[in-house]
Amino acid sequence: MSMSSCILPGVGKPGFVLKENEIEIGMGIHGEPGIERTNVKKAREIVDILCHKILKDMDYTNSEVAVIINGLGGTPAMELYIITKEIDEILKTKNITPYKYFVGNFMTSLEMAGCSISLLKLDSELKQLLDAPCNTIGLKIGD
C-alpha cells in the first residue's frame, strides 16, 4: 500500500501519480503501479483490505504465522506500528496466531510512503529457523 510513488533514478519522475486523496494497493517494490486505487481511509479499513487480499490466497486458519510489516522508505515507525496493531487484531479474529513480527524498513522503494505486508505460515522447522541467531546488515536476531 502506498500513499506516494518514488522518484525513479535516471528518470527523474514518479513511477505513478496519485491524487491527493488516493492510495495505491499492490504496487511494485521498484515503483511500478499497483493493481488498484482507493481513497485514503482509516488505518483499520486499509489493513482490512490488505489482509483480505492476503488471506484469500491461502488458508491460515488455526496456524501460527510470521508477519512482516515492511516500510517502503518514507513511512515513520509509529505508522508501521499502528498497522501492526491493526493486523494483530484482525489475525486474532480469524484464529490466526502471530508467532513473530518483523516491523521496519527491510526492502524499501527509495522515499515511497507506505508499507507491504507479508505472512509466512509456520511449522516447527520454520519457527526454529526464525528463532536462530543471525547478524546481517538488514536483520539481527539474538546475541
What is each model feature region?
Residues 1-82:
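Mixed-charge interfacial surface used for oligomerization/domain docking
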Residues 53-143:
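C-terminal non-catalytic interaction/assembly regions of soluble proteins
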